[in-house]
Amino acid sequence: MTTEQTHPNPLLAAPADTETPRTRLSARGLTLAYDERTIVDGLDTDIVEGTVTCVIGPNGCGKSTMLRALGRLMRPRSGVVELDGRDIHRVPTREVAQVLGVLPQQPTAPDGLTVADLVARGRHPSQRWYRQWSGDDHQAVSAALERTGLLELADSPLEELSGGQRQRAWISMVLAQGTDLLLLDEPTTFLDLVHQVDVLDLVRDLHWQGGRTIVMVLHDLNLAARYADTIITMREGRVVASGTPAEVLTPQLLREAFDLEAVVAEDPVSGGPLVVPVGRAGH
């Protein structure tokens, strides 16, 4: 399967770029473990510049663990993660933070924090001991709040926000960091469908308007099909398929990766694949 960026969905279509995109993140022979339990085993994958990549797979297959490793939040037992061609663990922490933003699953913040306080934390990698806060920092925070539609809620406590607004605040913090490479671990968790679409529309706009490279872990196959250029499918700690939504979301692969019998139809809006579950395979 190819990882070449295509846009079967006219809603996702961006201006064509004739240059060959470079690989921003890659994993080679990546093995990840917690204590003696191996979660990811010998994984290879590439994240291409200027694309939205969704990682899918059944529960416990290692999606979030792989994302943590790509974001330099855990060291591999073996193998290597490369950021722009360099071993990510040999790149200084501050330099990584100026290039790569990570939003973990279910992030938490101290009580009493306002939206603006949270977003300002995204500027920490840009600060030095001799220059704690500057006009550039203020501008970056304001721009991030405006981009996520939260400027009017800047002084509101986080606990007063709806689930969708709170998730936007966390994304705003990552935006304020000023990176062009974003890793989002299940950014739609615990949100109703309207807020899921709202958050993913925001992510798509960040990709379109800012040219950002985005990697997301998602559970909803049809949302992954709608918003992704590339889908990486995992099972039992390995990548079993990688390609465009149409290449990956086939009845055979859904059976092999998810033990799911499904009909794959054409999405009437995007023209891409639409997964209609039938039942568990073999039952």
Question: What is each stretch, according to the model?
Answer:
Residues 25, 39-42:
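Conserved structural motif at the start of ABC-family nucleotide-binding domains
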Residues 56-58:
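The feature captures the beta-strand-to-loop junction immediately N-terminal to the Walker
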Residues 79-87, 96:
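Conserved ABC transporter NBD signature motif
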